């Protein structure tokens, strides 16, 4: 089951509300004429279809029929249509959609002016055409598709009322409202009553951040190891060069001692080299002496060239 499906499953376990039903009718509903006015509400999610059916019964005592058919002959996706014949006209009147469903493309004004209905409307909008990327796999993105630009921009206005900076873009003859910041997505999930999904999203976000931190730490450590290996090899090459030129014996005793210890322990760390000296020496002291050897070798190479 996808992350989007998990969210929608959680949302359909919530109480029936007029605002959620209103959004589903507004976004997925269509009217027809068959022995009177009919209303069809279409979805590809079986749980959402049952939720619509339940809300119609509980809120308006409207009896509907759920019809199932394949999306296309080649598609495995099923389409669920909640079909209403008796009471369709009265229901649209109750929802204040009798005229606006066919004439108005935006979110009804009374929804935008009611704090509680707005939240429920957002829940219905996500059930209708919402999608959420799995936070464990890729980028953070929550989106809601609208057929009409006006509706998408009205949703954007509602999002902003709740402090969510949503954007709207056109894609494949649809208007897509989306959030791409993890914190705002979590706030939206809380707003529409999907607390389990919010916690799961947050857990995935934390795990991704921890893995990212571990990878960066590993890269940093690997870079340091590579740097240390290169420095050790440079010092060993310098010592061998000085030894071949009979220059090593001319150097001060402290440099001869570190040269001997370095050659005898090519894989030792700087700290370990310091502990092998008598008396022992700190890392900065060891590095200083090794740099002196490298400088001596470089100066001799310049003279020879």
Curated annotation (Swiss-Prot):
Role, per record: Involved in cell division and chromosome segregation.
UniProt entry keywords in alphabetical sequence: Cell cycle, Cell division, DNA-binding
GO function terms (MF aspect): DNA binding; endonuclease activity
Pfam families per UniProt: HTH_WhiA, LAGLIDADG_WhiA, WhiA_N
Cross-referenced PANTHER family: CELL DIVISION PROTEIN WHIA-RELATED
Chain residues forming the annotated DNA-binding region: 269-302
Entry similarity comment: Belongs to the WhiA family.
Protein name, as recorded: Probable cell division protein WhiA
The species this protein was found in: Lactococcus lactis subsp. lactis (strain IL1403) (Streptococcus lactis)
TM stretches of this protein: none
GO biological process, one term: regulation of sporulation
Matches recorded under InterPro entries: Homing_endonucl (IPR027434), Intein_endonuc_central (IPR004042), Sporu_reg_WhiA_N_dom (IPR018478), Sporulation_regulator_WhiA (IPR003802), Sporulation_regulator_WhiA_C (IPR023054), WhiA_LAGLIDADG_dom (IPR039518)
Disulfide links within the chain: none
